[in-house]
């Protein structure tokens, strides 16, 4: 029998990737992690809400509480024929670990766990507490995942001091970028009402597309704010428009428009909603609109977590990391409102959600070292 020569982090990453945990499935990933965390002295709580599996694991009862946050679910693989290797059969080719979830984010989960095991072995009497908040519903509707766990913790007044989310934050090399905040996200589902009719008799109909076009143009041209030193200006984007029956001789009776704001801390969701409604009303539209609040903006400024992260990355990689707030949303948006400082640090994100997703094996080793150094910087003072 050949001996497994994989490093601890590579071996665990392979084990996690081999489990087909497409949202909201977990497929035993959390149990695998829980068994090892229990051996390291963690108290394990499984929190299952509807179709979602969550894990809250904690070692220690004192503050401050350092929490690794992440997800075991992955996005669907897409066209299997375009994968060079089977997506759930992890393999290393030229120092790259291939498989769905390698970068987003089973590689990070493996690095978190191995770093924690090493840290506890060195410092069994560390300060404060270490926790893991892991969900199988980050890539999906995010209804029964991290947000429900946070609600549970808040209800019993269990507070997180610092949270490191393992999202793939790096762009060109490991640690070149960390996310110390995220923009808010607000979605509007607008239905503009008209009167269906024959295109040859427009006076007997009311075309909602024609009515809505000037308002949509104004919304698209609007400057919502100027941003600030931490956030770019708020962005309004139309994501989907649907109107008509598919026939060239029918004026539609309604127009459906889906749009999204990614907004800075210079505005609130309430301000954006008010301004949108004012524009729609000014154009005399008859409409219905539903709003979906996807997350508030948050920012972790200079403080213990950001400083510990910067120092760890510099020590391990030699890189002076660049804190940014760009990109999409993450589960950090559910943790930050509790008052916790939140940072995202993970592998290079070049292949996430793509076919042939992969991560450098050497980056997983460096990421493990970074996570361990962050623990030392915060809990060994």
UniProtKB/Swiss-Prot annotation:
What is the UniProt remark on how the cofactor binds and its stoichiometry? Binds 2 Zn(2+) or Co(2+) ions per subunit.
Top-rank taxon: Bacteria
Give the Gene Ontology MF terms in alphabetical order: acetylornithine deacetylase activity; cobalt ion binding; succinyl-diaminopimelate desuccinylase activity; zinc ion binding
EC nos: 3.5.1.18
Write out the pathway annotation from the protein's UniProt entry: Amino-acid biosynthesis; L-lysine biosynthesis via DAP pathway; LL-2,6-diaminopimelate from (S)-tetrahydrodipicolinate (succinylase route): step 3/3
Show the catalytic activity: N-succinyl-(2S,6S)-2,6-diaminopimelate + H2O = (2S,6S)-2,6-diaminopimelate + succinate
Q: One biological process GO term for this chain?
A: diaminopimelate biosynthetic process
- Entries under Gene3D superfamilies matching the protein: Zn peptidases (3.40.630.10)
Describe the family membership recorded for this protein in Swiss-Prot or TrEMBL: Belongs to the peptidase M20A family. DapE subfamily.
Q: Per its record, how is this protein called by name?
A: Succinyl-diaminopimelate desuccinylase
Organism listed in the record: Shewanella halifaxensis (strain HAW-EB4)
